[in-house]
Each structure stands twice: as C-alpha cells, then as structure tokens.
Amino acid sequence: MPHEKQDRDAEEIEDEGKNIILGIVSQLRPNMDLSKVTFPTFVLEPKSMLERITNFMSHPDLLLNVQKTADPEMRFLDVVRFYMSGWHIRPRGVKKPLNPILGETFTGFWKFPPSNSKDPNLQKLHGIAVYAAEQVCHHPPISAYFYLCPEYKVRIDGVVKPRSRFLGNSAASIMEGIASIKLQDLDEEYLITQPNVYARGILFGKMRLELGDHVTVRCPKTDLQADIEFKVKGFISGTYNSIAGKVKRVSTGEVLYKISGKWDSEMSVESVKTGETRPLLDVSKHDVYLVSARPLEEQGERESQRLWYKTCQAVIARDQTTATETKSAIEDRQREEAKQREIENVQWKPKYFKMIAPEEYILNFDIPNGKSDLEVLCALDEFIPIFSEVDRIAFHKFLSENTKPEDSSIHKHSRDASGDSTKGFAEHMPAPARRRRPQSTASFVTYRSDNGSVDEYHDAQLPDPNTLSKLHEEQDPAL
C-alpha cells in the first residue's frame, strides 16, 4: 500500500485554543490590520523572524556554483531553482515566527562542506558564508538582512516587510520587500519578491498554512524575468502547494520557459522552443543545511536566541502562561524604550544597517578591496559579531601563520590550485565549530521521513540552564 504523505501544513486546534482564537476574532473586522493584535503563544514558532529568514539560504549547493553556468538562460533558471528551494522548510501546522523587537539582531554562518552531511552536492563546496540581520524599524516592521560568501563572490541584501490583514476565515501576511542576489564575478543582480502567507480555517475547518499570489525574479542585465504564481486551493478543485510560472525576455515579451509543480516537492521546467521538459528541483534530493550561531553565553542581550530564550523554551514545552509572561515582558520593555526616546526627542537609528531609500536598507559596511576572503570575514566579524571566540582565535592564528611579513594580505599566497583561499582554514577549524548548531531552543535539526518530507525538530543540545538564568538576571530581572 503506498505511503500516504502526511499533511504537515494542516493543524487541529484544541477546543481551549479555538475559544481563545474566536475571542480575538470577534473583535476584528475584515481587512483589519493585525500588527497590534496579540496572538496566543500556541501559534508561535520558537524562532525569531530574523533567524527564520535563513531558511532561504539552506540549500547553498543550489546557489554558490551558479556563476559557473555559462549560458545566461540556464544560469537564470539556476537562480530560480535556488529561490524556490527554501519554501518547503517550515514548522508543522500554522505557526508564525516571533516578531523581532527594534534593534534585535541575529548573526550566523555556514562552513562548507558540512562535516555532518553525506550529500555529494554539499561536499563539493568549500569556504564560509555569513549572515547578519537586524530589526531596523518597528512601525512599520522591517527586517533587514545580509548574506555573503566571499569564496564564491555571492552577496544577498534584502528586507522583509510583513503587513498582516484579517480576511474573515483567514489571516494574511502580505510579504512586501525585495531581495537582491548579486553574482559579483558576472556583475549580475537578481531582484526577487516573496509570496504572501495565509493562515486558513481560523473560524471553521482545519487551520492550514498556504503560500499564495505572484512573485517575480528579474535580472536587468540579462533581460530575463520569471513570473511565478503560488496557487491557493479552491473550495472545490485544485491542489495545495502548486506553482505555475513562465520565464520571459522582458524587452520582447517572448516566453522562453514554463515552470510547474509543487513548491514542497518536485518542480519542472519546459522549453517553449523545443517542448522538452526537465526537472527544475526535487527538494527531497538536497540536504537542508541550517545556519550555525555563536554560543548563547557569547551573545548580546538583544540577539535573537538569547533575547527570546525563555519564551522559546516555554513555547516548546507548551507552557502558555510562561510563554505569554516572558514575551510580554520583552514587548513591554520595548514600549517603555519607545516612550523614553519620545520624551528625550531621540530618533532611533539602526546599529548595523543604513537606509538607502524609503524602507530599504543595506549593511552599513564596505567590503574591503584587495583582501583575502578570510580577511574579509574577519573584518565583517569585527563590525558585527558572527563567529565564536574559539573560531575567532583560529582565524587570527591561521592568518598570522599564512601571511608574509612583506604583504599583509594573504590573497596572493594562500590559494591552492582550485583557487580556494578559505579552504585551508575551513578544513582546520576547531572541531566544536564544525558541528556547532545554534545553542538555543530556537534552533532545530532536520530529519527526512520515509515519505521524503522535511521536518524540523528541536535540537536537544542546550546550554547550561544555570548559566542562562544568570544571563537573563543580568539582562533584566523582569525577563
């Protein structure tokens, strides 16, 4: 008998939870802004939005070698494939990430190849990629993020600007904001939008998560654009998680390729010219590679995993009282800070990002020229903490041992025959750093079930509770 795929996007809410939701909904009106509505903690994912964004960088093997594809059309499809690869990574049921507070940050990194993966696609990679995000605005909420892999000359800058709306039996998160993927060796930029997120079945039926509406992937230099529809299921017909799209030449409107499939499993691409159909992506054939972060005890009080630690612990334990109390304490402190700034006539300024246009931000850091990839990473780490103390010591030791006195840059001296300037370092990173996962209940490990679906489970490797209690007491007794 064939194995029936589990419906991981649907969720049955217990009667008590349903009553809480109905009590909230009774005070709402259609199309009402939900930004100031306090949701019950049982619908929360134990992870901040700043960390949640890293899901979209969890298939680096689909991005980092893109510049080796010579044909512009095939390279464009490679970028589309990478873009479509991140949506299947999500918690079970209908969960929303924690809303970051103003000034909250999250940083992390990926070291290639991952020592805990046998995926041949990942084993071919080498080097280090870094990520940094900051909540740069609270009204409206704006999360700015940055990704860089110096070895492969790939950079991503983006903002997420969610706008929540009540739609009757559904709640919608309108995901405004644009991501820019830069392939620096080719001087190409890909501008990308996001699908909207819908929570169905708020009043009746099963609660279910759906992605919907149109997104675009556009490359001005190659004159190519993908228009992709994330289809929502109709009341009578249709299927869940389907997509349909096309790739066209912008200047002429000529359709070159058609895209179809399901964003949580298999997708294919058809050439309009030849009629040939080939796989675009099968997510079951690629390991998910989650971000690593510094140990919790090395994080600042406004870094996501440390800030929300008690709330995440309580959410996972289904302790709604503690989750609500700790979450409210953090949000109350944020409101008090806002009042104090108003009294003192102080305008908030992001710490690590700068505004380049209304509601658009990039990292306020200039990548140094003429430096090795490792020196670039060290410079970034000095600007915004990314690596652990153990890794940082290893960085500087490697640099001192591989830098000639007459040349402070190791760019010309440390590359091997493959052109790799960080491989030598990455292979000798301290063993704990190789396998380190974010040491917080907000982190997850990945498990692939027999039916091919990807589930996220809480990482059992937690920091010492006594250390954490001390950290939080020092941060704020109320938290």
UniProtKB/Swiss-Prot annotation:
Task: Provide the Gene Ontology terms for cellular component.
Answer: cortical endoplasmic reticulum; cytosol; membrane; nucleus
Q: Name one GO molecular function term.
A: sterol binding
Q: Where is the composition biased (Basic and acidic residues)?
A: 404-418, 470-479
**Chain spans, region Disordered:** 404-479
Please name the Pfam families in this protein's record.
Answer: Oxysterol_BP (PF01237)
- Tell where it localizes: Cytoplasm; Nucleus
- Residue numbers of Phosphoserine PTMs: 328, 408-409, 421
Comp. bias (Polar residues): 439-452
Q: What is this protein called?
A: Oxysterol-binding protein homolog C23B6.01c
Please name the taxonomic classification of the source.
Eukaryota, Fungi, Dikarya, Ascomycota, Taphrinomycotina
